[in-house]
């Protein structure tokens, strides 16, 4: 949940149709706000800046800066170093030019290359301007046996007309990164380098943002963590300076020569191959990446050039190389986290949670976790329950009941902490007192406390650079858990957000607790009237009423505004202006001011580092502190954290949700590309606020979205205060649709869990783009409307209203690939390179199983605990040559270091299916049945370990070519995988 100012100011990509709202009365914490001091709206208004890319007066650094000349080149077995000296008079265009730089080219491993350019001279006073601490973001290390000859890369360089370099793939001679024809600009507040790209390039990543899967040419990509309700094509919560570049080649001639091709010109009959590589810039400063015709322009507000290249040559290999060497492998999630999660802003007391739980049970909808938004807090304060509505005594009773039923509860924890009113002796807050005693809060440049504003009023911020901050945070988590046995942490608002510019609480603490500088949803002037696109067609009367209400509210809120003149900052040699840097990135907040809705760039950490240099790391460091704090709550239990603000490497501690989206078809559409982005970034535990957060949802959108999200790793429904309720049991059709999709999700939970184990141990992905799984088909390069779960399950959702069919592609069908419909279990009749029209009436989501796959499955239950107690089954989908394979991983589902594990390999060929297990985890549930798809002839007999099975247990459908073998429990009474077995037909 984000600052509502961003929601109120936002506009949507698609046309909005309004409808009537059913208001929920805000919680007592919200209604009490009417008697509070309200922070003025003007407090969150910053300077009016013009983004450089939109500024007609902006100077093009490439045209005025001299670049550098390389000299004093020294070679070693692992690369070379050189001195780079300014090649002319300083341009000082957006800062002060650095005269002397040091270049280091290090061939770190066969598949990895690092190029670093840093100032030759710096000291403790300015090191953080350029050097990102390895304690914050580790640098990849060279392998012991790394050398130039064994590398997949070659680096060449030239001084004509100024220093430039190329990174070349040895295998193909393709130039992957090429700064020729451009100038390196390196200043204390501005770095720019340019690389050439092929025509119609295929780039993915560079987030966080909501956009198409494949990045668009002419896109302006800003990286700077921001608290903002999900806009399109703007920077939002996270910072991931990593991209995947895929290039397709036509293979032809006797020597199989490779010619690069555009994906739009691919022909189904032609043979292609692809090569992918990855590029990561280890830099935490604000950034802007401009994609232009056949080039990429990379600009930063400081730091250094610290580029790592990954040779791939497939997407899967690039992602593994990035994670294994650089950012770390994803956290292994608890098994239960793969169940369904229900949340909303507006559950006002424990009784409402009781009602929600009862309704899920009444309608027999699986439910694993209930989530609490800021409603549970005493005055919106972290680690402190409202004792009237969420008392610890009642909470203990409710959580005991919840836990006994195999379910769990997760509360939200925000990035800021309330600071008590010094003139009110009863305004006590022990968390603040303990933090103040250890002096662990961020300061102003003069050493005074930096005091911003968030939900509770005026607030302070943990300083993650302080040596005692993480222990302080861990102690608060432990102390709170001893009062209330929560089951994870939802870490929010850590971009880090503030509802005012500067240290606005300084001198104003007597006003605390203060109301935010905007109306909360449901308060006068902010009634939620918004509905999804198309609502006016299906609900005309209600839509007309809501439209009138929205118009009246808008008219009442209208006022005459004046625009402040644009502020332009002129660089002063030797001096940094961190509040208004001379180069203005296209930051999403009003006026592009870095101080708006965030703590100021000049706020200062205990080690002297200014927020300007590490802003986008705040959430990442808070996740780290939360992860290790939870390990003190539960010593050997995997911490469960879902966080909003992330950085490269956050996935080793937490999952992520897509933030404050909208109840719009557009938000649902972009949720797929959001999820696939985070697959690349090494954060596979990803989901979105299903049915939408901001605004009111409707039955059709929620029906489709509950089905789509059933195939995302993190599956949660969540919406905003005072919007209509949207739990899946609110509409009969949504109940049916939800249960239909959950029947599939819960059946394949063992497959999901196995995928997470593989991600955790190898760096593989859970959700996959078609182009990544089928790398030799250029026509798939931009497909972002369907996706794969692992290698075996493909989902083709409906993403628009009022339709009952959907268009989808079936990769590989022209090269022997077979796809089976999940529901009919028959092979799909599809042609290569063209869309297939698929029936998809409301309540049905098309799902397909890839030939060659074996899926281990269990039965559906209302909790994952109970689902894990059910018999096993296997779904074997034969390839065109009659083979299939799969695997299964099991453990206790929660231990950081499980003592007992089990791995099972499945292999089918020549009418034989084998299961081979290894490990010490005891799985007592028997095998109930095996279903084999694509069996072209009725078998004369079926045997298990040589024993002929009775004809009653064997069924064959000659039309669908499905073989079903049941009644296997008695043959596997000791457990489905207690011993190896062979099934023949």
Curated annotation (Swiss-Prot):
Signals that turn on the gene: By maltose.
Q: What CDD domains does this protein's entry cite?
A: GH31_MGAM_SI_GAA, GH31_N
Sorted alphabetically, the Gene Ontology BP terms of this entry are: polysaccharide metabolic process
Q: What is the protein's name according to its record?
A: Alpha-glucosidase
Molecular functions per Gene Ontology: alpha-1,4-glucosidase activity; carbohydrate binding; glucosyltransferase activity
Q: What class of enzyme is it?
A: hydrolase
Question: Which keywords describe this protein according to UniProt?
Answer: Glycoprotein, Glycosidase, Hydrolase, Signal
């Amino acid at each position: 949940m984000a600052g509502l100012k961003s929601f109120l100011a936002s506009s949507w990509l698609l046309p909005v149709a309004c409808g009537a709202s059913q208001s929920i009365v805000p919680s007592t914490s919200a209604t009490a706000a009417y008697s509070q001091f309200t922070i003025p709206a003007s407090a969150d208004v910053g300077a009016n800046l013009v983004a450089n890319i939109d500024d007609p007066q902006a100077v093009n650094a490439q045209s005025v800066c001299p670049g550098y000349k390389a000299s004093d080149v020294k070679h070693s077995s692992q690369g070379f170093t050189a001195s780079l000296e300014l090649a002319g008079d300083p341009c000082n265009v957006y800062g002060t030019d650095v005269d002397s730089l040091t270049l280091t080219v290090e061939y770190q491993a066969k598949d990895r290359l690092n190029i670093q350019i840093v100032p030759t001279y710096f000291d403790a006073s300015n090191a953080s301007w350029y050097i990102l601490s390895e304690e914050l973001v580790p640098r990849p290390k060279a392998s012991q046996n790394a050398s130039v000859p064994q590398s997949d890369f070659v680096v060449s360089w030239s001084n004509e007309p100024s220093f430039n370099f190329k990174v070349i793939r040895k295998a193909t001679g393709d130039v992957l990164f090429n700064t020729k024809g451009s100038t390196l600009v390196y200043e204390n507040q501005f770095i720019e380098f340019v690389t050439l790209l092929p025509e119609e390039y295929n780039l993915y990543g560079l987030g966080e943002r909501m956009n198409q899967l494949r990045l668009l040419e002419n896109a302006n990509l800003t990286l700077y963590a921001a608290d903002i309700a999900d806009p399109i094509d703007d920077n939002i919560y996270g910072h991931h300076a990593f991209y995947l570049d895929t290039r397709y080649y036509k293979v032809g001639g006797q020597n199989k020569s490779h010619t690069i091709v555009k994906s739009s010109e691919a022909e189904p009959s032609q043979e292609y191959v692809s090569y992918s590589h990855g590029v990561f810039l280890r830099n935490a400063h604000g950034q802007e990446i401009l994609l232009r015709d056949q080039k990429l322009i990379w600009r930063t507000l400081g730091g250094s050039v610290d580029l790592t290249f990954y040779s791939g040559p497939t997407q899967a290999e690039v992602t593994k190389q990035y994670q294994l060497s650089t950012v770390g492998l994803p956290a292994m999630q608890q098994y239960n986290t793969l169940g369904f999660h229900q949340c909303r802003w507006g559950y006002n007391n424990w009784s409402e949670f009781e009602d929600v739980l009862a309704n899920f049970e009444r309608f027999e909808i699986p439910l694993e976790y209930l989530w609490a938004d800021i409603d549970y807090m005493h005055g919106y304060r972290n680690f402190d329950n409202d004792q009237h509505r969420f008392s610890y005594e009642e909470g203990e009773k409710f959580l005991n009941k919840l836990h006994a039923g195999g379910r769990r509860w997760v509360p939200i924890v925000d990035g800021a902490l309330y600071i008590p009113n010094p003139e009110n002796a009863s305004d006590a807050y022990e968390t603040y007192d303990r933090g103040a005693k250890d002096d662990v809060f961020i300061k102003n440049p003069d050493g005074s406390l930096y005091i911003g504003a968030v939900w509770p009023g005026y607030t302070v911020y943990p300083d993650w650079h302080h040596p005692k901050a993480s222990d302080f945070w861990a102690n608060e988590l432990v102390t709170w858990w001893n009062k209330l046995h929560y089951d994870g942490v939802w870490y929010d608002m850590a971009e880090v957000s503030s509802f005012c510019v500067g240290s606005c609480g300084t001198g104003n603490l007597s006003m605390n607790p203060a109301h935010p500088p905007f109306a909360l949803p449901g308060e006068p002037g902010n009634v939620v009237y918004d509905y999804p696109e198309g609502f006016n067609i299906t609900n005309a009367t209600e839509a007309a009423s809501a439209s009138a209400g929205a118009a009246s509210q808008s008219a009442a809120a209208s006022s005459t505004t004046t625009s402040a003149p644009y502020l332009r900052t002129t660089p002063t040699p030797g001096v940094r202006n961190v509040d208004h840097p001379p180069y203005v990135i296209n930051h999403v907040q009003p006026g592009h001011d870095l101080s708006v809705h965030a703590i100021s760039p000049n706020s200062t950490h205990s080690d002297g580092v200014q927020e300007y240099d590490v802003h986008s790391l705040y959430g990442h460091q808070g996740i780290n502190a939360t992860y290790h704090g939870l390990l003190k709550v539960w010593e050997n239990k995997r911490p469960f954290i879902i966080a909003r603000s992330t950085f490269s490497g956050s996935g080793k501690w937490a999952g992520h949700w897509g933030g404050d989206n909208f109840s719009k078809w557009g938000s649902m559409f972009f949720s797929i590309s959001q999820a696939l982005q985070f697959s690349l970034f090494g954060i596979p535990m990803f989901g979105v606020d299903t049915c939408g957060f901001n605004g009111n949802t409707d039955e059709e959108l929620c029906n489709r979205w509950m089905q789509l999200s059933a195939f995302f790793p993190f599956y949660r429904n969540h919406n905003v205060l005072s919007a209509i309720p949207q739990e899946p049991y609110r509409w009969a059709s949504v109940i049916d649709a939800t249960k239909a999709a959950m029947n599939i999700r819960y059946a394949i939970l063992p497959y999901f869990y196995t995928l997470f184990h593989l991600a955790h141990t190898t760096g593989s992905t859970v959700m996959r783009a078609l182009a990544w799984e089928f790398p030799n088909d250029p026509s798939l390069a931009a497909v972002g409307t369907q996706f794969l779960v692992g290698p075996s399950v493909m989902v083709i959702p409906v993403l628009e209203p009022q339709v009952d069919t959907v268009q989808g592609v079936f990769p590989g069908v022209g090269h022997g690939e077979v796809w089976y419909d999940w529901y009919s279990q028959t092979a799909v009749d599809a042609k290569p390179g063209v869309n297939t029209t698929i029936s998809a009436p409301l309540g049905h989501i098309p799902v397909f199983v890839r030939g060659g796959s074996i899926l281990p499955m269990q039965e559906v239950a209302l909790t994952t605990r109970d689902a894990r107690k059910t018999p096993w089954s296997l779904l074997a989908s034969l390839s065109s040559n009659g083979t299939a394979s799969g695997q299964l991983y099991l453990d206790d589902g929660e231990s950081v270091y499980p003592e007992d594990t089990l791995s099972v390999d499945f292999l089918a060929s020549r009418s034989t299916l084998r299961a081979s297990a290894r490990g010490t985890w005891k799985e007592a549930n028997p095998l109930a049945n095996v279903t084999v798809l694509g069996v072209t002839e009725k078998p004369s007999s079926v045997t298990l370990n040589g024993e002929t099975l009775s004809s009653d247990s064997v069924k064959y459908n000659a039309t669908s070519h499905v073989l079903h073998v049941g009644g296997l429990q008695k043959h596997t009474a000791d457990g489905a995988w207690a011993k190896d077995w062979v099934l023949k037909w």
